[in-house]
Amino acid sequence: MDIQHDLVIAHKYKIIQCIGSGTFGNVYKGVNVKTQDNIAIKMEDKRTSYKLLKRETSIMKYLYEHHCRNIPAVHWFGPVNDYMGLVIPFYECSLIQYRKIKSITLSKLNAIMTQCVSILESIHNNMVIHRDIKPQNFMVKQGELFLIDF
Protein backbone atom coordinates (compact mmCIF):
# COMPACT_ATOMS: atom_id res chain seq x y z
CA MET A 1 0.00 0.00 0.00
CA ASP A 2 1.57 3.22 -1.14
CA ILE A 3 0.23 6.19 0.85
CA GLN A 4 2.36 9.31 0.81
CA HIS A 5 3.42 10.73 4.13
CA ASP A 6 2.27 14.28 4.77
CA LEU A 7 -0.97 13.55 2.85
CA VAL A 8 -3.81 15.61 4.36
CA ILE A 9 -7.19 13.87 4.48
CA ALA A 10 -10.48 15.78 4.62
CA HIS A 11 -8.52 19.05 4.96
CA LYS A 12 -7.87 18.10 8.57
CA TYR A 13 -5.88 14.89 9.17
CA LYS A 14 -2.22 14.64 8.17
CA ILE A 15 -0.48 11.26 7.82
CA ILE A 16 2.85 11.16 9.69
CA GLN A 17 4.07 7.56 9.57
CA CYS A 18 2.97 3.95 9.15
CA ILE A 19 2.66 2.23 12.54
CA GLY A 20 1.16 -1.10 11.53
CA SER A 21 -0.14 -3.27 8.76
CA GLY A 22 -2.77 -5.93 8.48
CA THR A 23 -4.52 -8.17 6.00
CA PHE A 24 -6.48 -5.39 4.31
CA GLY A 25 -4.36 -2.28 4.80
CA ASN A 26 -2.18 -0.12 7.01
CA VAL A 27 -2.57 2.01 10.11
CA TYR A 28 -0.84 5.37 10.25
CA LYS A 29 -0.09 7.77 13.03
CA GLY A 30 -1.37 11.18 12.09
CA VAL A 31 -2.20 14.58 13.48
CA ASN A 32 -5.28 16.77 13.39
CA VAL A 33 -3.79 19.87 11.74
CA LYS A 34 -6.30 22.16 13.47
CA THR A 35 -5.96 20.88 17.05
CA GLN A 36 -2.55 19.16 16.86
CA ASP A 37 -4.10 16.06 18.52
CA ASN A 38 -2.53 12.75 17.55
CA ILE A 39 -4.86 10.43 15.66
CA ALA A 40 -4.74 6.99 14.03
CA ILE A 41 -5.72 6.55 10.39
CA LYS A 42 -6.70 3.13 9.11
CA MET A 43 -6.40 2.94 5.31
CA GLU A 44 -7.73 0.01 3.30
CA ASP A 45 -8.05 -0.68 -0.42
CA LYS A 46 -11.45 0.52 -1.63
CA ARG A 47 -11.94 -2.43 -3.99
CA THR A 48 -11.30 -5.24 -1.53
CA SER A 49 -12.45 -4.03 1.87
CA TYR A 50 -14.90 -1.14 1.50
CA LYS A 51 -17.81 -3.12 2.98
CA LEU A 52 -15.70 -4.41 5.87
CA LEU A 53 -14.39 -0.99 6.88
CA LYS A 54 -17.85 0.56 6.50
CA ARG A 55 -19.28 -2.18 8.74
CA GLU A 56 -16.53 -1.65 11.33
CA THR A 57 -17.20 2.09 11.29
CA SER A 58 -20.95 1.58 11.69
CA ILE A 59 -20.45 -0.75 14.65
CA MET A 60 -18.04 1.64 16.37
CA LYS A 61 -20.39 4.61 15.85
CA TYR A 62 -23.35 2.60 17.15
CA LEU A 63 -21.50 1.49 20.28
CA TYR A 64 -20.04 4.94 20.93
CA GLU A 65 -23.46 6.57 20.57
CA HIS A 66 -24.89 4.00 23.00
CA HIS A 67 -22.27 5.02 25.58
CA CYS A 68 -20.40 1.73 25.44
CA ARG A 69 -17.41 1.68 27.64
CA ASN A 70 -14.08 2.43 25.97
CA ILE A 71 -14.95 2.33 22.28
CA PRO A 72 -13.01 4.79 20.07
CA ALA A 73 -14.87 7.76 18.64
CA VAL A 74 -14.97 7.80 14.84
CA HIS A 75 -13.62 11.20 13.82
CA TRP A 76 -13.98 10.63 10.08
CA PHE A 77 -14.69 7.91 7.52
CA GLY A 78 -14.53 8.24 3.75
CA PRO A 79 -12.67 7.77 0.48
CA VAL A 80 -9.07 8.84 -0.06
CA ASN A 81 -8.04 8.24 -3.68
CA ASP A 82 -8.15 4.43 -4.14
CA TYR A 83 -8.53 3.83 -0.41
CA MET A 84 -11.08 4.12 2.36
CA GLY A 85 -9.92 5.88 5.50
CA LEU A 86 -11.06 5.66 9.11
CA VAL A 87 -9.80 8.22 11.64
CA ILE A 88 -9.94 7.42 15.36
CA PRO A 89 -8.01 8.63 18.42
CA PHE A 90 -4.36 7.61 18.69
CA TYR A 91 -3.49 5.18 21.47
CA GLU A 92 -0.11 4.75 23.15
CA CYS A 93 0.20 1.01 22.52
CA SER A 94 -1.65 -2.27 22.37
CA LEU A 95 -2.08 -4.43 25.45
CA ILE A 96 0.55 -6.82 24.11
CA GLN A 97 3.05 -3.95 23.70
CA TYR A 98 2.12 -2.61 27.14
CA ARG A 99 2.97 -5.99 28.66
CA LYS A 100 6.43 -5.82 27.10
CA ILE A 101 7.26 -2.32 28.37
CA LYS A 102 5.59 -2.39 31.79
CA SER A 103 5.99 -4.74 34.70
CA ILE A 104 2.54 -6.13 35.44
CA THR A 105 1.79 -7.13 39.01
CA LEU A 106 -1.00 -9.51 39.91
CA SER A 107 -3.19 -6.62 41.10
CA LYS A 108 -2.53 -4.70 37.84
CA LEU A 109 -3.37 -7.82 35.83
CA ASN A 110 -6.61 -8.13 37.80
CA ALA A 111 -7.47 -4.49 36.99
CA ILE A 112 -6.69 -5.04 33.29
CA MET A 113 -8.84 -8.15 33.10
CA THR A 114 -11.67 -6.38 34.92
CA GLN A 115 -11.53 -3.60 32.31
CA CYS A 116 -11.53 -6.15 29.47
CA VAL A 117 -14.58 -7.93 30.86
CA SER A 118 -16.36 -4.62 31.47
CA ILE A 119 -15.78 -3.52 27.86
CA LEU A 120 -17.01 -6.86 26.50
CA GLU A 121 -20.04 -6.78 28.77
CA SER A 122 -20.86 -3.29 27.52
CA ILE A 123 -20.77 -4.26 23.84
CA HIS A 124 -22.65 -7.51 24.46
CA ASN A 125 -25.38 -5.58 26.27
CA ASN A 126 -25.79 -3.68 23.00
CA MET A 127 -26.10 -6.89 20.99
CA VAL A 128 -22.64 -6.71 19.39
CA ILE A 129 -20.10 -9.52 19.45
CA HIS A 130 -16.44 -8.79 18.71
CA ARG A 131 -15.08 -11.70 16.70
CA ASP A 132 -11.37 -11.04 17.15
CA ILE A 133 -10.64 -10.67 20.86
CA LYS A 134 -6.88 -10.63 21.40
CA PRO A 135 -4.37 -8.43 23.25
CA GLN A 136 -3.45 -6.59 20.02
CA ASN A 137 -7.03 -5.27 19.76
CA PHE A 138 -7.05 -3.75 23.23
CA MET A 139 -5.33 -0.38 23.09
CA VAL A 140 -3.94 1.55 26.06
CA LYS A 141 -4.20 5.28 26.67
CA GLN A 142 -3.24 6.76 30.04
CA GLY A 143 -3.75 3.38 31.73
CA GLU A 144 -7.23 2.88 30.28
CA LEU A 145 -8.16 0.18 27.73
CA PHE A 146 -10.04 0.67 24.47
CA LEU A 147 -11.29 -2.06 22.13
CA ILE A 148 -10.62 -1.68 18.39
CA ASP A 149 -10.90 -3.69 15.14
CA PHE A 150 -14.53 -4.59 14.87
Question: What are the residue ranges of the model-derived segments?
Answer:
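Conserved N-lobe ATP-binding subsite of Hanks-type protein kinase domains
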Residues: 26
